[in-house]
Amino acid sequence: MKVLITGSAGRVGRAIYIKLMSNYNVVGMDKAPCSTADFVGDIRDQHLIQRALQDIDVIIHTAALHAPHVGLHSDDDFYTINVEATEQLALLGIEAGVKQFIFTSTTALYGSASTPLGQAGWVNEDIIPKPKSIYHKTKIAAEAKLEAISVKHKLPITVLQMSRCFPEPADTMALFRNSRGIDARDVANAHLCAIEKKLSGFNRFIISGVTPYSKKDCQPLYKQADKVIIEKIPALADAFKERGWLLPTSLDRVYDSTRAQQQLGWHPKHDFNSVLAMLDDESAEVLPVLKSN
């Protein structure tokens, strides 16, 4: 089976490329030259896409403008890259005989729906988004385009909405692994599971770390998060104490990835212990915690 990964020079695209390359014939495409970019160029370039799609069975589309690009690129750029290029890629894939399309999206698109007043938000795939930025709006629009394409052309499309997945200070990353964060390696594995599960139709899943919290914890997490953490994750509380870090008194949301775990057979394994281990190993995947003066 041959798989095309767009955005293959990025953190997530590269992680997916490396995860798949031992079992699949993988080709990558990115605007940046890289060891995992077999095709180099603009995701909007139709002729480049057509060349890259030769003999491709599965498309994994990670290429996009992201939140850090807001204010640096025009709204038109966001629309042409995140929406129009996504639609074009799917349609050209259908012409080329692609059998499956996997779209890497984001939990950020839920916007203010993630943070209701007075309690932590419990966010699953049934929540109606309330976008706040052009990034959110274009990701929502891209998902809508893909759903319409899936229905019209009978192309199996799986959307994977990943939570926070970038280097942050270790205390923040460790906390978020239980509520709103994910390791790039677990994201890559989710894409592998989506390929192998071969779900029909259009499907959407939140990809985030396993949470020990439940819906009934939403109000306590917002008002007394430190007490909830001590009760639910004593090992994390102990690690914070040993390292001289303070537990937060409030958390504003929890992303629930239960549906992905159940329907894709996906099981994230890189929890807060992985964050601490990477910190101790001086990995570039996690930032040190700076002591306040």
Feature roles, as predicted:
Residues 88-130:
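Conserved Rossmann-fold NAD(P)-dependent oxidoreductase catalytic core, especially the SDR/UDP-sugar
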Residues 257-263, 270-293:
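Amphipathic terminal alpha-helices
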Residues 190-252, 257, 263, 289-291:
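Mid/C-terminal beta-alpha module of Rossmann-like enzyme folds, strongest
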Residues 80, 115-154:
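Catalytic helix-loop patch of NAD(P)-dependent Rossmann-fold dehydrogenases
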Residues 31-45:
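Rossmann-fold cofactor-recognition segment
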Residues 3-23:
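N-terminal Rossmann NAD(P)H-binding glycine-rich loop of SDR-like oxidoreductase domains
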Residues 140, 152-155, 167-177, 194-205, ...:
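Glycine/proline-rich active-site loop of Rossmann-fold NAD(P)-dependent oxidoreductases
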Residues 43-81, 92:
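NAD(P)H-binding glycine-rich loop region in Rossmannoid oxidoreductase-like domains
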